[in-house]
Amino acid sequence: MIVFRNVTKVYTAGSRALDSVNLQIDDGEFVFLVGPSGSGKSTIIKLLTAELDPTSGSIEVNGYRLETIKKRQIPYMRRTVGVIFQDFRLIENKTVFENVAYGMRIVGASSKEIKARVPYVLDLVGLENRGRRLPHELSGGEQQRVAIARALVNNPAMIVADEPTGNLDPQRSYEIMMLLESINALGTTVMVVTHEQELVNRFTKRVIAINEGKVINDGMDGYYINEET
């Protein structure tokens, strides 16, 4: 569960990125977080992964209260949230298997655990025959699937996908969204951060709209108007 209570974030330059934001995402939900560039979406991601501290307010992430969390607990909290980046952030000289396994190695998983878990996750995302490939040998859609597998490998409670289809054509975008839906159906909470109007409106999900640092709409109508277009 993610809870923001009256969260405000003001950067050192004085710009107010978030203004008294209240939101709650329950376990097992699928949520779109939408808004134009500069609306505060990226700040929300950085706050819930403890990359930033709020100026005021409180944040709870999967049972961790971030205003009181100890530094040594932050890595454990972050393991409960798998982040998928728009630019994939794959290690170019490592195979698909090694890229996904990396997430397990940094938390101290054994070779036996890695050999059992990584093939399972690659199969889940449809890359069971791509484990020995390097990133440059894959299509954009396949690279995004590797990024999803890496985010999933430590079995997080929640996946945060930051513009996961921004570099993909419409068909590949739809396939990635269907994959995220299937992951959500297995019980993982999914938050997709996007400004793509057509993508959001194609799926009937909860939509949290943010603009100028404020939540301006939160509903299950699955409809979003991107005012930038």
Model-derived regions, located:
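Conserved ABC ATPase signature
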Residues: 134-138, 142
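Helix N-cap at the start of a conserved alpha-helix in ABC-type nucleotide-binding domains
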Residues: 170-172
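A short, proline-enriched helix->beta-strand linker immediately N-terminal to the Walker B motif
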Residues: 153-157
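Helix-to-loop junction immediately C-terminal to a conserved catalytic motif
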Residues: 49
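Conserved ABC transporter NBD signature motif
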Residues: 57-65
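Short coil-to-helix segment of the ABC ATPase nucleotide-binding domain corresponding to the Q-loop/switch region
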Residues: 94-101
